[in-house]
Amino acid sequence: MELMDIIKARHSIRKYTEKQISRDDLEKILEAGNFAPNAGGGQRSMLVAVHNKELTTYNGFYDAPTVVCVFCQDNFLFKTADAFCMMENMLLQATELGIASCIISRGQETFASEEGRQLMKQWGVPEGYTCQGFVILGYIDGETPHSKPRKPGRIKIIGCGELG
């Protein structure tokens, strides 16, 4: 698939089958996230993939069998931008592999509890990191939705014409 075809084929999916994605596909998706642009080239983010359906039962994950948590350094100004670049790369790679995906926010709130902090410690997430969001992955339960037509007037090009 061409890149623009992948971009247009990507949809936020919120209904999944129980079928787990392969470890090989998960590693490709994580690699795509790892190669996302990051402010200043500092690579201050960290991905933790939960590849176990029993651990992803939180209802905010729409029964997806795999959840990737995107952690970033608290004190970094561009942590949100870095996280979303990583998440978008993962979504595009998943789409190319035929895997459904969706970005879920509320990462900071999810890990704000004592239980959440204990999970982070157990997973080896360093002190001073917070979860900026999640990418849920799996196989769509149902039909792939069609893209909505894009609203006109959302793109402007300034200064591209010939000067007279």
Task: Identify what each model region corresponds to.
Residues 1-164:
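Acidic, surface-exposed loops and disordered segments
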